[in-house]
Amino acid sequence: MAKDFLNGKRTHFGNKRSHALNSSRRAWKPNLQKVRILVDGKPKKVWISARTLKSGKVTRV
């Protein structure tokens, strides 16, 4: 399972709840993108969430 390289975001699991409060399992997945960034001065392909990219915490190479 992919995980955000910087802040460790990953899939969260829980229940879907219908109007009658029946439950079934579901997953919330972060919007992960494979991006080349500089890690220790070298370019590396890592998984980064779109939210992290938009915030400017990471710059692409």
From Swiss-Prot:
InterPro entries: Bacterial_rp_bL28 (IPR050096), Ribosomal_bL28 (IPR026569), Ribosomal_bL28/bL31-like_sf (IPR034704), Ribosomal_bL28_bact-type (IPR001383), Ribosomal_bL28_sf (IPR037147). The keyword Ribonucleoprotein applies. Residues 1-26 are annotated as: Disordered. Keywords: Ribonucleoprotein, Ribosomal protein. Residues 9-19 have a biased composition (Basic residues). GO terms for cellular component: ribonucleoprotein complex; ribosome. One of its GO terms (molecular function) is structural constituent of ribosome. GO terms for biological process: translation. Belongs to the bacterial ribosomal protein bL28 family. This is Large ribosomal subunit protein bL28.
